[in-house]
Every structure is written in structure tokens, then in C-alpha cells.
Amino acid sequence: MTKGILGKKVGMTQIFTEAGELIPVTVIEATPNVVLQVKTVETDGYNAVQVGFDDLRDVLSNKPAKGHVAKANTAPKRFIREFKNIEGLEVGAEITVDTFAAGDVVDVTGTSKGKGFQGVIKRHGQSRGPMAHGSRYHRRPGSMGPVAPNRVFKNKHLAGRMGGNRVTIQNLEIAQVVPEKNVILIKGNVPGAKKSLITIKSAVKAGK
């Protein structure tokens, strides 16, 4: 069965296993998510569970949003997302961190850090030219096809805005779950800046 939860990235730290091995982990704080709506094939055309995370101040919420969350008997939420193919949950139910356990393999989605306008070396990992005195090619994007096609090729790597994209890292392992602090520790790093929204789901390719 698919499992999922929304949380906020706190930062990175490190833990030690019983064997003394050091593991770098990302700390995700996931306070209880509330089920706001259950979608079915009959009514919506697909099966999904809509969950809300992080209470929003009453002043910042409008009447339709308040009416929507009132059915779940909860406060307005800052983040609302859907998880498909989750069964056995009703409106108003809570999803907590102990839904997952240490050793579970998950897919983690977040918004990568925005880097602004960057050149091709930083943005695409291209190699630079010689830095010698006689060289006239240092950090340029390279050939634009000026002779034969008389145009710039489609998908040519050029400078532009970097980061700020939705990124999913697959098959990350949960190192530890701390229910009393609503915290999940995930091995390695996950996309996004501190305090950014993180989506944790059961890995799609875990059994393959």
C-alpha cells in the first residue's frame, strides 16, 4: 500500500549506527497531516487522498478554504497536496510520522534551491576553455552552429535561470523515525532549502 506525508526540511546532521558507522541524514519535521478529502473513481474519476499540512492563521484564509477544512474539523492549512492509491483513511484522520519506519525506502520531492541567472559551466557542468593569455575562449557556451544550420540548435545548453525546480530523488532510505518529536531522518540529502515543503512517498521502484 502507498504511504505518504508532508513535512518541512529542518537541515542536515549526522547519526551513528550501533556498529559506529557515521551516516549523514536530513531532518524532516512532519507534524500530523490531516485528511481533508477522500477522492474516489465514482465521484472524481480517480482514487486519492487530499491532505493538509501546517496550520494557517485564520486571518490569511478565505471562506471557501475554511468551509473545506471544516468537514475535517481542523484549522486551515498552508499546504494541501494529494496522494494517489492510499486506502483506509477517512476525512479528519491524521497521518503521523510513525506511518513510516526505519529501513523504509521512499521517494522525496522538493523544490530545488534557486541559484538565479547562471552560466553554462555552473548550470550544465560544461568544461571551460584554456585560461592562457592567448586563448579567447574561457567560459563561453560553445558553438551555436553559425555556418551549416544557420540557426541555434534546439535544446542548446545556454545561460539562464538555474534551480527553483520540482525535483524528486528516488529510493532514499529512512534512517530513523522519532514520533515524539514528529521527525523523520532520511539518509543523504534531499532537494530544497531549509523550511521548504518536502513530500515523502513510498518508493515507486523499491521492489524492482
Swiss-Prot record:
Region annotated Disordered, chain positions: 123-147
Transmembrane segments: none
Annotated GO CC locations: cytosolic large ribosomal subunit
Disulfide bonds: none
GO biological process, one term: translation
Xref: Gene3D superfamilies: 3.30.160.810, Translation factors
Gene Ontology terms for molecular function: rRNA binding; structural constituent of ribosome
InterPro entries tied to this protein: Ribosomal_uL3, Ribosomal_uL3_bac/org-type, Ribosomal_uL3_CS, Transl_B-barrel_sf
SUPFAM superfamilies, A to Z: Translation proteins (SSF50447)
Function recorded in the entry: One of the primary rRNA binding proteins, it binds directly near the 3'-end of the 23S rRNA, where it nucleates assembly of the 50S subunit.
Family named by the database record: Belongs to the universal ribosomal protein uL3 family.
Protein name (record): Large ribosomal subunit protein uL3
Gene that encodes the chain: rplC
